[in-house]
A protein has these predicted regions:
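N-terminal signal-anchor transmembrane segment
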Residues: 6, 11-79, 97-106, 159, ...
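Loop-to-helix entry and N-terminal half of a specific, functionally important transmembrane alpha helix
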Residues: 37-43, 218, 222, 387-416, ...
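Transmembrane alpha-helical segments and their membrane-water interfaces
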Residues: 70-81, 102-160, 199-202, 411
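Alpha-helical transmembrane segments of multi-pass inner-membrane proteins
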Residues: 143-171, 186-255, 382
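A membrane-periplasm/extracellular boundary helix in multi-pass inner-membrane enzymes
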Residues: 158, 253-307, 322, 326-329
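Long extracytoplasmic/lumenal interhelical loops at the membrane interface
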Residues: 170, 183, 309-368
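Hydrophobic transmembrane alpha-helices and their immediate junctions
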Residues: 251, 259, 367-410
Length: 451
């Protein structure tokens, strides 16, 4: 099967990647796609229904997301398993088994196990979906979930505009509000921000499908609006990586063969990233000044330091990581089985309340011990390798943007526990990350076969 992208024909054939018509059991494929639709319905309810904390949508996600995952696993195991599918199922099963073991050990100690369903869904369904469903070329499931996250970006923009205009409905005021001077939705500004970054990334993936100038102009304006709402969250790490995402996408679009075009693409990307970063800081200062002028000192609950302080201690992250090291030193049992009390342990070693380690890999060490950290590192290496290969060959804009988005999510996870854990409010980020990771692996295999 051949595909034409921008006039460049590529052969996209790989023996392990089968379409729904080519498999021995098309009924199993329909169940796999149906399972993804079930997850999308749960995610859609989770995104729409506010306030979610201990509410119906939160419960649906936490309890019932295991159902589509189990249906998917059953359909996958009922069909023929190629080696890539088998390898990813084994890796996901290893992650799930160790997660279950640690939760069982914690349960023996009297701690209630939670979020098992969403973790099972993440590693039992989202990670192997692209290979197991043979969707690497058709991308039907990918289009569905990207459409959902595109709608989420629009929803967050609507929330931000309503908050700026002071017209948030009463039933949303507990979920959409100013956290000090920061725009907060989806439970916290630091959760809202990466979801907006994902919305921007999905919008960039649509670029190659728009052929008319006015369509692309509207898309640029829409991305600008999302970036403006992202600035309101004051999530500086996410803002930086969103600038990298936009600049990297421009680089991939302009990059051609030859050193001159390569240099021009690099220069354009650097100028765009620098301009966006400087502009975001200027707008953030103006917004903060206006908010502080309109609110009393008692209403400003959230205080953030300037960039000068952030460069020195990464907004207190270095102190938190030092506390995590001391906690591991004084509680070596964590290295074996993890703990449910990471926040309490970390708070003993610093002067402020800490709920987690503010690093995905350090947090998974606290949650699941060294075996969990090893599995997370293996997945990280594979994902980074797949993304870098796709960026190097730059086969088509959508794939390059997907690779950039995955790397940017990893970058944000260096300062927040977005990945590898069982925090409910962060599962939408992890779902998309793992799903995209599977597609990147499929596309890298296709690219290798075509060479």
């Amino acid at each position: 099967m051949k595909a034409n992208f921008g006039g460049i024909k590529m052969q996209l054939e790989h023996p392990s990647v089968k379409t729904i018509e080519e498999v021995e059991n098309p009924a199993a494929r329909r169940v796999q796609y149906g399972s993804l639709i079930g997850l999308l319905v749960l995610l859609g309810c989770y995104f729409l229904l506010e306030y979610r904390g201990n509410g119906v949508a939160w419960t649906w996600m936490e309890v019932y997301s295991v159902i589509p995952a189990m249906l998917f696993m059953g359909a996958t195991l009922s069909g023929g398993l190629t080696r890539p599918v088998r390898n990813r199922l084994i890796f996901g099963a290893a992650f799930l088994i160790w997660f279950a073991v640690t939760k069982a050990l914690h349960r023996i100690e009297g701690v209630e196990a939670r979020s098992i369903g969403v973790f099972f869904c993440a590693y039992g369904m989202c990670l192997p979906f692209a290979w197991a469903s043979g969707d690497g070329k058709r991308r039907r499931g990918l289009k569905w979930i990207l459409g959902l996250y595109l709608g989420l970006g629009a929803l967050l923009v609507l929330y931000g505009l309503m908050l700026l205009g002071g017209c948030v409905p009463g039933y949303l005021r507990d979920a959409v509000y100013w956290d000090g001077t920061r725009f907060s939705a989806m439970s916290h500004p630091n959760v809202c921000a990466p979801l907006l970054m994902i919305g921007i990334g999905v919008s960039l993936m649509c670029w190659g499908r728009l052929n008319k100038v006015w369509q692309r102009v509207l898309l640029i304006l829409w991305i600008g609006v999302q970036f403006g709402v992202l600035i309101l969250t004051s999530a500086r790490t996410t803002i930086v990586f969103t600038c990298v995402l936009l600049g990297g996408s421009l680089f991939c679009a302009l990059r051609k063969s030859g050193w001159k075009r390569f240099a021009i693409a690099c220069l354009a990307a650097v100028v765009l990233m620098g301009g966006l970063f400087v502009g975001s800081q200027m707008l953030s200062k103006v917004h903060k000044t206006n908010m502080e002028a309109s609110q009393t000192a008692g209403e400003i609950k959230n205080i953030q330091y300037g960039w000068g302080s952030d460069i020195k201690n990464l907004n207190n992250r270095t102190e938190i990581w030092s506390s995590a090291r001391k906690g591991l030193r004084d509680n070596p049992r964590i290295l074996l089985e993890g703990t449910e009390y990471s926040g309490l342990i970390l708070s003993q070693y610093n002067s402020f309340r800490v709920y987690h380690a503010h690093n995905s890999w350090l947090q998974v060490l606290y949650d699941m011990g060294l075996p969990g950290l090893l599995l997370a590192l293996v997945l990280t290496v594979v994902v980074v390798y797949d993304a870098l290969v796709l960026l190097w060959y730059n086969p088509e804009p959508m794939k390059s943007v997907a690779a950039l988005l995955v790397l940017c999510i990893l970058g944000c996870s260096f300062l927040e526990p977005y990945l590898f854990g069982a925090y409910m409010e962060k599962q939408p980020i992890q779902f998309l990350f793992l799903l995209l990771s599977g597609y990147l692996d499929c596309w890298r295999a296709e690219l290798r076969k075509s060479k």
